């Protein structure tokens, strides 16, 4: 018997055993969406990353999220061949992109923007973009996951 590309040899004809074996293989085959979003974000150029965030969140939110004072800098980052965000700013932009993609994919762009700029009880009533600026990456990603999977209700 072949399951996907993995040959499975059933030594016993016990169907309960086969069912447990197949459930284990299916569980291993499930792609973690968080890892997939991380991979897709990491493959974006810094210009494309900034461009998408500016388009959906606006330059002011992107600048604050990245921890820069110049509100025009996100536009400059968006230009091909333009300046590149520093490492700390790029890291914050990547986390913001992952959170935005998770929510926008599930709920839509307008809901994702509202989630990003609104007070969040999981973040002590702080908006997620400010929490990212403060370096609270894990709580923001946990809040985004809770919002997407419905445990935020």
Residue ranges of model-derived segments:
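Non-transmembrane "mature" sequence context
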Residues: 2-153
């Amino acid at each position: 018997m072949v399951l996907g590309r993995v040959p499975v040899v059933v030594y016993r004809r016990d169907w309960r055993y086969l069912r447990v074996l197949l459930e284990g293989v299916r569980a291993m085959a499930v792609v973690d969406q968080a890892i997939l979003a991380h991979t897709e974000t990491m493959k974006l150029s810094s210009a494309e990353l900034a461009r998408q965030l500016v388009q959906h969140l606006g330059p002011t939110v992107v600048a604050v999220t990245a921890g820069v004072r110049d509100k025009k800098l996100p536009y400059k980052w968006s230009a091909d061949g333009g300046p590149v965000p520093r490492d700390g700013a790029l890291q914050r932009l990547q986390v913001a992109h992952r959170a935005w993609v998770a929510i926008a994919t599930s709920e839509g762009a307008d809901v994702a923007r509202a989630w990003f700029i609104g007070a969040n009880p999981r973040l002590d009533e702080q908006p997620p973009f400010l929490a990212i600026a403060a370096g609270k990456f894990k709580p923001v990603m946990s809040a985004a996951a809770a919002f997407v999977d419905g445990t935020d209700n």
